[in-house]
């Protein structure tokens, strides 16, 4: 389900100054480096009409490696690695661009490109086929904000592939990518993170799950790329207070194996490249300046891509540098990774094959249905209870908690049938066969953190509605009612509810007919655990 996360970060200057008391900062405050070594490009491509970003797309046949350029209104341009232009594909106003390998389309692994279309502020998808991009998107995926860049991230846990779009207003939108039965690629939002000002670039590390974002006025951030993880950022380097002089620029990741995994970032104001050690918490390693083959300085490097694969004349791969201000017109420079690391007395290591798709750590089970997103931001969709219709399974119902707003009742297509804004409901459970007013009913209870109470409902399976049947507020007497479950004794037929406090204390109540069409609780016993119990499941044995 979609998770909407908003970091309440107040402003660029206040943000950096607050790091000691908030998000972690990976670097000490130091003056910018001086006297950085100069590294010349190994190749300058021929000038293109516009060069927003470029990626090298690898092929099994090295002669068919391609450089794909996001060329603004010219769409996507295709060049060989000598810089010769081979073709062009319409893609709207192409800006940001990224590539991943082994994406399944109709059961076949394909090389997938994602690009931003700045005309519509949307994402478009292409498969690399016979050396050229072929559009395979089910649609142009709208973002709803002014997009600046896009990067992709493969989740190592389940193998899911995500596109991460960043925007002019500080938006970070993470979308899960999938192909339908017809082979069309689509996306759905997984989470949104907001920073208070423009994010210009992003890059992601599939191996570690780290997402890096360049907030232009502030610096380089590192996030956990798992959409279910805490979105708390760590500041790798800061503009003004760190090594970045004024504005943070583009980002790239190089993987040379153990001891040679680097984050590369540009200082948009000075034109320097900064290199950080991803194996040591992104510790700073050194800085360099770049020139073209002719020695002309690359004053403001644009988008970057690092390719850790042997290329012709470049045994450790290349850093693709966008040079929008080249004298002869915008082009791309290929900088030898070996030359760059050598200038900084670093090891290039052993280039890792970016085309190798590592098997996910856990098996993947694909859902056959998904509910509409809950209305509250953050980790709000927490706990479901399912009523299974024994006669017509398609009419079964799902009750889910919105931990910040109440309960939702869904049908089996995921549509919201009812929303009850009754408080912060943490967990929910149900039992059939409770006798209320002489009739068996489906009884539903939830741990209500707003009123510190047991919330009690009857599920009307015909009307498909939840009806509050609590005999007034049923207080728990707990400081923070948290994990909850129900139990029906097979021996006595009595129905119970258990709720634990966040301090580990658990309390049990019997649910009884109050005689007025309502239900009340009668406290049965207390017992304690040494720490907080998030959720308890009970199996009826007597």
Language model region names:
Residues 2-25:
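Gram-negative bacterial Sec-dependent N-terminal signal peptides
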Residues 27-542:
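Sequence/structural signature of beta-propeller domains
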